[in-house]
Amino acid sequence: MREPAFWHRPHAWQSLLLSPLSVLYGAIAAHRMAQSGLDAGVPVICVGNFHVGGAGKTPTVLALSALLRELGEHPVVLSRGYGGRLAGPVAVDPAIHAAADVGDEPLMMAAHVPVVVSRHRAEGVGLAKTQGASVILMDDGFQNPSLTKDLALIVIDGARGLGNGRVFPAGPLRAPLPPQLARTDALIVVGSGAAGEAVAARVTAAGKPVFRAHLQPDPEVVAALAGRPLLAFAGIGDPQRFFRTLRASGLDVVGERAFPDHHPFSTDEIAALADKARHQGATLVTTQKDLARLRGHRILGRSDPVITAFPVTLQFSDPTALRSLVAHRLASARQRQPFALSAPG
């Protein structure tokens, strides 16, 4: 889905027209968030956001999985598998699954950390535990009450913030902000910008910690692409962030094409991009998530076109403070779970 432009305008007439629906949607969402969830029997860390669309959750999940391994944990990611046909529960295997089976984000993450896809998250807990999970990392699902969360981390894009601050469909918020803030344990601001700082100020005023992070491109890929004209395309929550990252890396982006999030690329679309790249003497470049979705696409089996993925990793500005918060919450969770007192060795 493409975000409507009026979501980022403060007094758009469309938002005013949709306000009654937002009141109803917000009331239902807030009531749902207040419900109790299943205790998974192992600590659950949720990485979510306040709003619809991309904010950097996937690289945050991967960065947190690395941090948890440093703490001696064995994290398993639990995802709804948006865009995949399998309801699950299923353990994602990149050797046999495609994005059409399990979704593009789980497929991409499974190259780095064990991932379980389950349309109903509570049903995926058992499989995650059989995969050796000492901690479950929920990819999204902050507003979903099905599981009790021991640590809720909210991710926002510093450049975008919360748009017009209104609840869907008048704006991008998934629920009214006050009940979401009440259930937030910490905020992670990815990148910089006044919009993100405004959200950070509200979270700080609520007595919650704020962590800063940035996306770090792979230096070897940047070096390989330097000096080459690039035709960039992306079907993610915020394609413009990807294009900005390319340019901020000093790369020569001669053209760009934005698609909706989780867009199922057609052979004709890829062929058209390849033709345009040839005419411009450009290299096709996209995100890791988009390349995961293109995996197995028959046109990619040919020698032409060659599509380069542009990998990024999330770097925390103060990993020590975040590590301390995570370790404290894990210890607290295990105090109420006597059957899971010790972390794996």
UniProtKB/Swiss-Prot annotation:
Pathway where this protein functions: Glycolipid biosynthesis; lipid IV(A) biosynthesis; lipid IV(A) from (3R)-3-hydroxytetradecanoyl-[acyl-carrier-protein] and UDP-N-acetyl-alpha-D-glucosamine: step 6/6
Keyword Ribosomal protein among UniProt keywords: no
Gene Ontology molecular function: ATP binding; tetraacyldisaccharide 4'-kinase activity
EC number, UniProt record: 2.7.1.130
Single biological process term from Gene Ontology: lipid A biosynthetic process
Top-level division of the source organism's lineage: Bacteria
Pfam families: LpxK (PF02606)
Keyword annotations of the record: ATP-binding, Kinase, Lipid A biosynthesis, Lipid biosynthesis, Lipid metabolism, Nucleotide-binding, Transferase
Positions of ATP binding: 51-58
Broad class of enzyme this protein falls into: transferase
GO cellular component, one term: plasma membrane
Catalytic activity: a lipid A disaccharide + ATP = a lipid IVA + ADP + H(+)
Family per record: Belongs to the LpxK family.
Function: Transfers the gamma-phosphate of ATP to the 4'-position of a tetraacyldisaccharide 1-phosphate intermediate (termed DS-1-P) to form tetraacyldisaccharide 1,4'-bis-phosphate (lipid IVA).
Protein name: Tetraacyldisaccharide 4'-kinase
